[in-house]
Each structure stands twice: as structure tokens, then as C-alpha cells.
Amino acid sequence: MPDLPATPPDDESPDPRIGIPGSPFADRSGQPAQAVPAPRRRRPSRRIVLTAAMPAAAAVVGLTALTAPRPASLGAPAGDEELAAALAPHLGGHRRVAAILVEDGQSRLAGFGTGEGAALESSEFEIGSVSKTFTGALLAVAVERGELATETTVAEVLGAEAEGSAIADVILAELATHSSGLPRLASAAAGGGSILAGMLRKDPYRGRDAQQVIADALDETPSGRGEHAYSNLAVALEGQLLATAANTDYATLLTERILEPLGMTSTYAPVTVGNLRETARRGHGTSGLRQDMWTMDGSAPAGGIRSTPADMTRYLTAMIDGSAPGAAAATEVLFEESGASSTAMNWFLEDFGSGQPITWHNGRTGGYASFVGWDPSSGRGLALLSDTARSLDELAVGVLTGEVAL
């Protein structure tokens, strides 16, 4: 049967950090933490809405039970042979994968099922919620240019449009750190329709454009503001506010301020299906079934970017050495916890037990998984891209902490 939990573009847990070995979030069920400057927070409870979708779900199950996907088989290795050999034993359940390792400013690239040379470098992947880090970079650039501040409110960007909204005084820093009180998904878009889209292997965010996403957010009443509650809606709103303030759309802002300066010509936010390039391919759910491509419309700032190994090498290298536009997004902590974890502008900084914080974000759509992170103390960085929606987090953290030998 198809994958059920396709609503978030990261993973099924309320917070993408929960469940990663070594993470202080792995087993916690209510540890308090202090925000900067917000109050202490608790791990949010999982909310699952199934009732409205049950009749349709039963029909889908009946249809898909007749279809058996082929077992996953990791593709032929390509690129750096040593890197491929070290990673292959950890990639069970995956098919087409690209891995970028950066050490001492030098990069190594390996792939599976991608082909060699230019074919490997140009393979297109959905990067899911790693897209949030690009939105964080856009926020950092806007702050550097003096256009906005992390304390800028929703009302200051939207003006009269935000009048009377319960989130009018929410600030950009809260959106970028998942502490605004906004839910994971908009109430208008959540529930049975979203779950059914996942079961049908469709993009659950499709069909709600930028203005609808803004309107959805303005209609929400924050709950638990000042506490960490992972929210795709918050980051979607963040990106749309940045675009509104710059008098443009999100895809154009992304291209002009981040992608073009880095030479990332193969990276883009299609936003709608009509803007997908010929290089776009469908991925696989954890069941092995093909999934529709996710473009995410107005929610693209939270997970709708597509990229290639060559471009992600440029991005990772520039983030590590600080030369990327908006690189401060990864270092300016806006929400600090009492333990070994904090949040910058859409980046997580976390000590997984090695004694050194790792800067990272993961991503997951219906048919893809991704991870980008690095150890600032050593400069070692890793990006993993897969066309199967199976978590890469444990492998990635193992590489960055040295638990997985390369």
C-alpha cells in the first residue's frame, strides 16, 4: 500500500530532530528548554487526523493492494570509488543516491544509479525541507541589506492585510525557528484531504498559491507560541513575506539572491508542475511505489526546491566557508535550548554526542530524502540526496561525528 505519512516534507515525527541517534530529542517527552528571548518549551505531541479520510483511504487500499512495487535495489556506484564503497552498506532500501563529502575545502562526489561524470553531477533531486535553509539565507540577506530585521512583524510586512490577525505581531525570527505557535500545516489545508493526497501519492501542498498560504496563516490562532513546534506553514509564510517585502515572488527572489551568485544554475523552485524542467523525475515512497513530484505551490519556501549534486556541492562548500549569500543564517542563533541544541535561521545546531555541534537540516517529500550538514569545528560537511523517501539522517550524522568510517 502507499505511504501514509506524506504530509510533512521531512519525516513523520513532529520535529525532524526526533529519532536521530545521539540527538537530545531522541527520547525526550517534555524536557524544558529556554528560547532566546522566548520562554522554555516542550516537545510537541503528535497529531494525526485520519477520520475524514477513512472511506477514501479504504478504497485506495483496495486498489493499491493489487500493485506490488519492485524491491529497492541500490544502483551501480559511480564517482569516488572509496566514498561509494564506504556508504553503500548503509543505503539499504535506496535506489538512486548522490553523496557529497567536503573536507579541508575539497569535495568528493559519489553516486548510485546516477551514471558517471556529467550524468552524476546533473542528476536532479527534490531536496524537501533542506529548502528551508535557502529561505533562511534569504532572511539573512534581507537583514544584511537593511530591508528587514529578525524582529520585523507580519503586520509590518503585510500592512492592512494583517489587521485583526492573531499572528500580526509574530516576528520573522519566530517563523524561522518554529516558535511562532503556527501549526505544522494550515488548518484549511490539513486533515483528510492532505492525508488522501499522500495516499494517492500526490503533492499534498499543490493548489494553494502564495496569497492563499498567507491568508491561511493569517486565519490561524497561534498555540504554544515561544515553544518549538516544527511548522511548514511558518516557513512557507516566512518565504512569502520575504518575497512580498522585496516586491517579487519567492522563486525569483531565490534565483536572484542565492542561486545566481553561487552559480547554481540547475537549482530552482518550480512552484507549479508547469515549471518543472525536463530533467525532473518522480521518486519512490518507502513502499517502493512511484510518487508524484512535489512543487508545493505557495508552500515552496518550506520544501519545494530541486537541485543537483554539482549545485549542492557549491552550496555546501560556500556555507561551510561562509562565502554563500546569507551564510549568517547558519550561525546567528535565534532560539537556544538549555541542552545541546539551538536553532539559527532555519538551520539546526546540535551536539549528537561528539562534543561538537553539527549544523544541519534534513528533507523528505513523498518520493525523496535529503540531508545537508557540517561540523564547523572540523569543516567536514556532507550532503546526501536520494530518490527514495527513506531517512538518511542516521548515516549522515554518523559520517559527521566519525561513527561511520570513510
At which residue positions do the language-model features occur?
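Aromatic/pi-system hotspot detector in well-structured domains
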Residues: 134, 235, 283, 374-376, ...
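Hydrophobic (often cysteine-bearing) scaffold residues that line and stabilize catalytic clefts
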Residues: 79, 127, 131, 135, ...
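Short active-site loop at a secondary-structure junction
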Residues: 95, 116-175, 221-231, 300-303, ...
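Short, surface-exposed loop or secondary-structure junction motifs
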Residues: 165-366
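Catalytic loop of the DD-peptidase/beta-lactamase superfamily, centered on the K-T-G motif
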Residues: 2-111, 122, 243, 248, ...
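Short, solvent-exposed coil/turn elements at secondary-structure transition points
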Residues: 115, 160, 272-273, 353, ...
